[in-house]
Amino acid sequence: MKIIHLSDFHLDGETLYLEHKRLLNALITDIDKYYEEDCILVFSGDFLNVGGKNIHSQNNPFVIFKENVLDCIYTSYPLLKDRTFFVAGNHDINRDSINTSDKLAKKQLLKEYEQRDNIYDDFQKYLPGFKEYNTFVSDFYRDFKEEKNITFLESNFIIKTKDGNKIGITSLNSSFLCYDSDDLGNILLLDKQLRNSIEFIDECDVKIAVLHHPIDFFHETEKEKIQKILEKEYDLVFVGHTHKVKQEFKQTLNGICFFSNGKSLNGEESEITDYINGYTIIDYIPNQTLKVHLRNYSNICNKFVPNNEYGNDEGIYEVSINKNIDNEKEKTLEISDDFKIFLK
């Protein structure tokens, strides 16, 4: 299976600027090198720039993003429409709708751990700043034909690949407390977000988590716990936010997990190399190999090229995976003939 990982588009108007149209066209062309029927498209947040403040249309700004970006991709790759999974980023919250009471409640949550489970149920009824986003999510997945469970704080999906594997995808809203620009150390993932998600996709062969923020951005009381849970329960984790590429394959006592921090697809231009726009293709064979294709956008050539700063000359690196996703095989213990003599 192949996973196309996009992140951080930051749509800043009702239409795309010329350079952004060129980038999108180049992306669509580049995807063709890797595309196959079982591809999954993951977008790890920041559809909009600063809550869409420069989008003055009466239409939902996320619908405008879909029309300008996603629909162009679907024109070339229509099967991706039912295999697209995304989360909100910190730029996708409407901060104009956040009031003083919301900000005071956030301070209380960060101070008092025991209040966090209680607030989960309240946020499932009303999530400040996410009215437009949650409406978009509901509409986008209305005709989704496979298993789904969509809520304001986490959404979960189960799809099947052509080779019979069940893939569980968890979309975790890590941006629900992004009431200002000071995210670092001031955001949470609630226990129920994780517990409910793990339960829904528990019997899947491959488990994927998508969230906007890397682990380092969470509150100090949460970071280690979140890291351990993701490593134990998921095979692949996709994040965004930093606009910097970072790929980690972790094999610890907790489990085996690949973390992909996506580049900005369309962030602010910068002379800093790490901020060159790009995206990633993950070629994943469960229990065998994981191949990562790192792609950078060249403004000079108007096309995507290999990012060979992190991979080989072709922007590729590959790792072998020893994890066994067959639960029955995991329970099998083989004893060598040489050792059996000690058991007589």
Model-identified regions with their sequence ranges:
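Extended active-site neighborhood of metal-dependent phosphoesterases/phosphodiesterases
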Residues: 63-188
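Active-site-proximal beta-strand elements of phosphoester/diester hydrolases
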Residues: 1-13, 166-178, 208-212, 258-263
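N-terminal active-site segment of His-dependent metallophosphoesterases
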Residues: 1-64, 69-82, 94-95, 196-203
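Conserved beta-sheet core of the metallophosphoesterase superfamily
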Residues: 216-293
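A short C-terminal boundary segment appended to hydrolase-like catalytic domains
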Residues: 283-344
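Divalent metal-coordination and catalytic microenvironments
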Residues: 8, 46, 65, 89, ...
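Active-site-proximal segments of metal-dependent phosphoesterases and phosphodiesterases across multiple
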Residues: 174-238, 242, 247
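Active-site environment of divalent metal-dependent phosphoester hydrolases
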Residues: 10-15, 48-52, 86-101, 179, ...
